[in-house]
């Protein structure tokens, strides 16, 4: 049962009352015919009485058949209503999923753009790193050459001083 079981019971009782009140005219007509038959008694033509009995039986059967068909129609209408609600729910779910897919596709595009931008930045930075590494090697070589030259000059000066000391001394 659903959460609103009281409402379900009331709805079913109302449906039953509606069905009974709708068919009450048939029951009243049958009752009237029955009373007329009792009043007339057994007088009259037996063939007519038999025909009336047969017609009353046929009318009763048709009334029962109409009631069954009405019940089936009501049941089918309820099933149709449930099916329509289910379809609507699934359509809403499908629309929500489509929107979610669109949003995710946009997010994927953004991420792809960011990845591409990062790859470009990485390439630029690697190029800059290569240039700076080359420049650093050049500067280190120049510095080493200069230090080596200064060391050689100091060695030459020391040798000169040494040789001057030896000759003067």
Curated annotation (Swiss-Prot):
InterPro entries hit by this protein: Autophagy-rel_prot_16_dom
Membrane topology term: Peripheral membrane protein
GO biological process per UniProt: autophagy; protein transport
Gene3D superfamilies reported in the protein's UniProt record: 1.20.5.170
Subunit record text: Homodimer. Part of the ATG5-ATG12/ATG16 complex. Several units of each may be present in this complex.
Functional summary from the UniProt entry: Stabilizes the ATG5-ATG12 conjugate which is necessary for autophagy. The ATG5-ATG12/ATG16 complex is required for efficient promotion of ATG8-conjugation to phosphatidylethanolamine and ATG8 localization to the pre-autophagosomal structure (PAS). Also recruits ATG3 to the PAS. Involved in endoplasmic reticulum-specific autophagic process and is essential for the survival of cells subjected to severe ER stress.
Name listed for the protein in its UniProt record: Autophagy-related protein 16
The organism of origin for this protein: Meyerozyma guilliermondii (strain ATCC 6260 / CBS 566 / DSM 6381 / JCM 1539 / NBRC 10279 / NRRL Y-324)
High-level lineage: Eukaryota, Fungi, Dikarya, Ascomycota, Saccharomycotina
């Amino acid at each position: 049962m659903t959460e609103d079981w009281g409402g379900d019971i009331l709805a079913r009782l109302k449906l039953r009352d509606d069905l009974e009140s709708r068919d009450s005219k048939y029951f009243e007509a049958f009752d009237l015919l029955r009373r007329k038959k009792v009043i007339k008694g057994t007088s009259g033509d037996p063939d007519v009485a038999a025909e009336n009995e047969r017609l009353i039986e046929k009318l009763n059967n048709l009334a029962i058949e109409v009631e069954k068909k009405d019940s089936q129609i009501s049941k089918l209408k309820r099933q149709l209503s449930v099916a329509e609600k289910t379809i609507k729910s699934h359509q809403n779910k499908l629309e929500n999923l489509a929107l979610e897919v669109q949003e995710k596709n946009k997010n994927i595009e953004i991420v792809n753009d960011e990845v591409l931008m990062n790859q470009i930045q990485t390439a630029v930075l690697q190029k800059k790193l290569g240039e700076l590494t080359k420049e650093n090697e050049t500067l280190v070589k120049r510095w080493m050459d200069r230090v080596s030259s200064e060391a050689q000059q100091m060695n030459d000066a020391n040798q000169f001083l040494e040789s001057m000391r030896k000759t003067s001394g």
